Amino acid sequence: MPWVETTSPHFAARHELVDDDDVAGVLELLEGTRERLAEAFATIPGEVEVVVHGSDAALAAAQPYLPVLRRMVAPAARRYLVGWFGAGSIHVLAPRVLIAHASNVAGSREMNLLAPAALYAQLVVGVNNPRLPPPFGPARFARYVRWAWLQAGAAQWFSGQTGHARAAIARRLREGPEPDFPPGVRDAHLLGGTVFDLLAREEGEAACVHLACDLPSGGADEALRRAFHGRPLRHTESTWRSHLARTASAHP
């Protein structure tokens, strides 16, 4: 299948010819996401390369950290690991494959189709937080795993994925042990966004940006205490668990 290139003002996509029409929609989504994030974050990447893959095998071959991460996450989140980001680039499955990956529960299709926006948001967080990737290497990947709740969680919230995650969150709470707070890598790519959703409700979007852009020396505990105005971590954890339960039980 021949590869072609489609461009927009700030993105250049390489993809199979069969995905030509769908990629135009991906670039439109990315331009809208860029415009929104430019209002919130101090720095936005220049032109970003978007590589749209027609199969899981092609994506995994191009981005070998992704299969490693998939083995670490809970089954409820695995279907949403559909791409990767690097310095000046994002790799993602084609929309037709994203739809095939989705389950039949409410919101699953929408979450996967927002994956390009979430990957771009992870790139933006990394550009604004020098201690987070990109670039990736063994040490940076290990740090990403430790802070996935923050980088991936911020991306879920800023891209709009969290608003569609109710059914997937409910499945995760039914099927596995109680999640950690903040969520470990097993749950970060599904539940991380709920931490930012809670913070946005209590402190506003600016607090979410600040949390995403700063890694204090005291680790996650210090980051969360500062974000929630010094509130003891156990109180924030209790509030988050209540928020998680409400999210999972809310009507679509």
Residue spans of the language-model regions?
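Extracytoplasmic/secreted envelope proteins and their assembly/folding machinery
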Residues: 27-34, 121, 152, 156, ...
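Zn2+-dependent metallopeptidase catalytic core
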Residues: 18-76, 113, 124-127
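Soluble non-cytosolic domains of exported or imported proteins
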Residues: 17-31, 106-115, 145, 149, ...
